[in-house]
Amino acid sequence: MVTDIQARNARVPDGKTGAFPTLRTIQPADVEACGRAAYEAHRTVAAAHNYPPEHPSVEFSIGLIGNKLKDPNAWGILAEYDGRILGSVFLNLFPSTPVAVIGPLTVDPAAEGGVGRRLMQAALDEARQRGIGQVRLVQSPSHLRSLALYVKLGFEVREPLLLVHGAPPATAAIEGCVVRRATPEDALACERLCVTVHGFARAFELRSAIEQKTATVVERAGRISGYATAIGLRGYAVTEATDDLKALIAGAPAILGPGFFVPIRNGALLRWLLDNGFRSLWPAMLMTAGAYHEPSGAFLPSIAF
C-alpha cells in the first residue's frame, strides 16, 4: 500500500507550473474537492467530443467519490500541490476474483507533466502488492492522452465497446428462452457458467445482485444458459450464446442508468439492438494488464469490466 510518506517521496513536476504534486490517501474531507475535480475533467472531455457527459452533475461526481471512499473494496489516492487537488484514482477490488479495476481516474485538465501517470502507477503498484495479477479498466477513446498512457503502462485493448441506450424490447422475446428473476439456489449454476466463459466466477457481485433482486437468469429447456446481475452500466451478463443475451435484454425489468456496454465484435447482438430501437451513445474500450482469458461465450461487461 502507498503510504503518505512514500507518496511524499513520489513527486512529479507539473508541466505548466513547475510544481511538484504529492500523492496521499483520500480522506473524507477531500470528497467534495475530488468530486468537483472529477466533474470538470469529465465535462471538458465530453464537451470537446460532443458526447453525453459520463458525470452529469457536480453532485453526481461528489456522490461517486463519496461512495468509493466508503467502499471497503476500494482504495483511493489523490495528487495535490499547495492544497489544490490535481487528480485522483481508485483501485477497485472484486472479492473472489483475480481481477482489480482502476477507475475513475481523473486529472485536472490544467495539470500536466505526469500526474495521471503517477496516479496510475501507484494503483498498479497497489494491485501488485496485493497479489492481483489482472488489472482492467474501461477507456473512452475520445481521450487520446489517457489511451497513450495506458498503453505505455502495459495495458492491451481487449474489446471495443459501444454504450447503447433504449428500452427492453418486450415484443422481441427469443423463442425457446425463458427469463426469470434469479434466486439464491441459482448462484452455483451461474458461477459455473461464469467460470466457463471468463475463467473465474464473479460470485460477490452475483450474490449481491440476487439479494438486491436485480439479477435475472435465462433458461433453455429448463437449464440456466445465462444470467445478468442487471442490464445497465453497473451490471454485467454472462451467457452461452448471443440469443441468451438477447433474451435477458428483452426480458429485463428495466435498463438501469444511461445504458449498457455492448462488445462491438458481437455484430449479431449489436444489429439486433439497433433494429429494436436502441441508439448508440459513445464508444469505449475494455483494456487489461496482466493475464487475460478470452471469453468463450457471449457477455456484456459492466462499466468496471
Task: Pin down the residues of each PLM region.
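Intrinsically disordered, low-complexity, positively biased terminal segments
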Residues: M1-P21, P28, L69-K70, A74-G76, ...
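Short amphipathic alpha-helix that is part of the acyltransferase structural core
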Residues: V2-L64, R158-L161, A170-A201
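Active-site-proximal cofactor/substrate-binding loop regions of enzyme domains
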Residues: G15, R24-A127, G131-I132
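Short, structured interface segments
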Residues: L147-T171
